Swiss-Prot record:
The keyword Membrane applies. This is Cytochrome P450 monooxygenase hepH. Disruption phenotype: Abolishes the production of heptelidic acid. The keyword Transmembrane applies. Belongs to the cytochrome P450 family. Keywords: Heme, Iron, Membrane, Metal-binding, Monooxygenase, Oxidoreductase, Transmembrane, Transmembrane helix. The gene is hepH. InterPro entries: Cyt_P450 (IPR001128), Cyt_P450_CS (IPR017972), Cyt_P450_E_grp-I (IPR002401), Cyt_P450_sf (IPR036396), Cytochrome_P450_monoxygenase (IPR050121). It is found in: Membrane. Heme binds at C455. PANTHER family: CYTOCHROME P450, N-ACETYLTRYPTOPHAN 6-HYDROXYLASE IVOC-RELATED. It comes from Aspergillus oryzae (strain ATCC 42149 / RIB 40). The chain crosses the membrane at residues 7-29. One of its GO terms (cellular component) is membrane. SUPFAM superfamilies: Cytochrome P450 (SSF48264).
Length: 521
């Protein structure tokens, strides 16, 4: 017993000595020791842990980050290893285009547990090759060729809205639009019918799974390698356990199983003689995301089933939630501004003329009020609230500061898009600001990011959003139902994507009229 007590004392003494030495190093000898910021944040990552995990309702470090800049200036050491900059003029320096090389900060890349997808790729050159492989799925020509596919799912979306007419029940926009965007993604990317819009129970469960991810994200930011460790557990066993302790997360892992099944079917049906088709996909839209990767110049190990599945999951998770929340927020803002809504509706109907047919994407993009409303919603409600750290192998200069090489450096989209010097009255929904936008405003409209890590799905997102908005706004009269800015719309938590109050029931509307515009022909 005495020996155990002695060993514990030695271990405790070692931990205290190590912690003291590490703190002294970080405060006085670390390459970032001279940079401004709270001393406690420089000494330990538990400072950030407190704001993201302990301080209610979680995910609060983004507010503390803003306070740091108010106190210490535009460049701040936010934890022992990382620098954050709040200066719009420097955004295009950090998030620079090719040939500038920027690696992703490894903990940030590992957080989602999908290190084989483009979002989780650390190395700049490997990211560029992986991105080029899937680019044919996201170019404008490919997307415009699939308008008919998107229209099929818009028909199902209108069926959902129509089913609420006369019921006096509200429709949850985030749940409904998530089912739509997810169905479109499965069909367009994987040639698979997910059927969420035809199964309200499955749609609601998928919504709960996304909410569970949001709730877990602040924790995963603090322990970014956790999911990689969990992935070592066989998936069926992991699902069995989670169904009993956290069924919403188990549902998310069911998506991993489904993606593995989709990849298996693709691999089994891939004929050896399909090379002519693969070559042709370089000129037209590939049949699926996996066909695009197969047709690329990536080496064979980059076309392995596990790699394909992780790339598929990356696209699915990145595209579904962001598109659905943009749709919900745009509808919210237009319903709060009925005079703008009427202008948007009128120009959509004028573009259609007497045809009662939805105008194509090119025509919709040319509509000034619709375009300005989408841009303004993107600016106001840009999905990513987290800072986005990159690493460079060379020193970076900011003002009089020289940031050492291999230091993670980050900026935040909100600091640009809500900057009152760039966008006056920044928290007001004002689409008209885009009619006479300055070159600076257009250049710093960065909801999809900038540089080599810019969102690859921008054109796809615009297409599914423009087309569905045009139909919903022209066809249905909606009114908000018990929806409050402070509780249901305003971001109060950083869960990588911004999230409202945990008690929010979501943005909800009632369907009060159906004008039968753009109905099935």
């Amino acid at each position: 017993m005495a020996s155990l007590t002695g060993a514990a004392a030695v271990l405790l003494a070692f931990i205290l000595a190590y912690s003291t030495a590490l703190t002294i190093y970080r405060l006085f000898f670390h390459p970032l020791a001279r940079f401004p910021g709270p001393r406690l944040a420089a000494a330990t990552k538990w400072y950030e842990f407190y704001f993201d995990i302990i301080k209610s309702p979680g995910g609060q470090f983004f507010k503390e980050l803003s306070r740091m800049h108010d106190v210490y200036g535009p460049i701040v050491r936010v934890n022992p290893d990382e620098i954050h900059v709040r200066d719009a003029a420097w955004f295009e320096v950090l998030y620079a285009p090719n040939p500038t090389k920027r690696n992703k900060y490894r903990p940030s890349a590992e957080m989602a547990g999908l290190t084989l997808g483009i979002h989780g790729t650390v190395d700049h050159d490997l990211h560029r090759r992986r991105r080029m492989a899937i680019a044919p799925m996201f170019n404008k020509q490919s997307i415009l060729s699939a308008e008919h596919l998107i229209k099929q799912h818009i028909d199902e979306l209108t069926d959902v809205f129509e089913s609420y007419l006369g019921t006096n029940n509200p429709i949850n926009l985030q749940t409904t639009f998530l089912a739509y965007t997810t169905d479109v993604l499965y069909h367009y990317m994987f040639d698979t019918d997910a059927g969420y819009q035809r199964d309200s129970g499955a749609a609601q469960q998928w919504r709960h799974s996304m909410d569970a991810v949001a709730q877990a994200t602040p924790f995963l930011k603090q322990f970014p390698s956790l999911l990689s460790r969990v992935a070592l557990i066989p998936l069926p066993m992991l699902i069995w356990v989670l169904k009993r302790i956290q069924p919403d997360v188990a549902g998310l892992l069911g998506t991993h199983q489904l993606m593995a099944s989709i990849v298996s079917k693709y691999m089994a049906s891939k004929p050896e003689e399909d090379q002519d088709e693969l070559i042709a996909t370089k000129a037209v839209k590939p049949r699926t995301l996996f066909h695009a990767i197969e047709a690329s110049s990536l080496p064979p190990h980059e076309k392995a089933p596990t790699r394909l599945a992780q790339e598929g999951l990356t696209v699915l998770f990145a595209g579904g939630e962001t598109g659905s929340r943009l749709l919900a927020h745009t509808v919210y803002h237009l319903l709060k501004n009925p005079e703008i809504l009427e202008k948007v509706r009128k120009e959509i109907l004028d573009a259609a003329g007497d045809s009662n047919q939805l105008p194509d994407m090119k025509a919709l993009e040319a509509l000034p009020w619709l375009t300005a409303s989408v841009r303004e919603s993107l600016r106001l409600r840009a999905a990513t609230t987290s800072r986005l750290p990159l690493v460079t192998e060379k020193p970076l200069a900011y003002a009089d500061w020289v940031i050492p090489p291999n230091t993670p450096v980050s900026m935040s989209h909100g600091d640009i898009l809500h900057n009152e010097d760039i966008f006056p009255d920044p928290m007001k929904f004002m689409p008209s600001r885009w009619f006479n936008a300055s070159p600076q405003q257009n250049r710093l409209f960065v909801p999809f990011g900038k540089g080599t890590r810019m969102c690859v799905g921008m054109n796809f997102a615009y297409c599914e959003i423009y087309m569905s908005l045009a139909v919903i706004l022209a066809r249905f009269d909606l009114e908000l139902y018990d929806t409050r800015w402070e509780r249901d719309v305003h971001y109060t938590r950083d869960c990588f994507l911004g999230e409202p109050d945990p008690a929010s029931p979501g943005i909800r509307v009632k369907v009060v009229a159906d004008h039968k515009t753009f109905t099935r022909s």
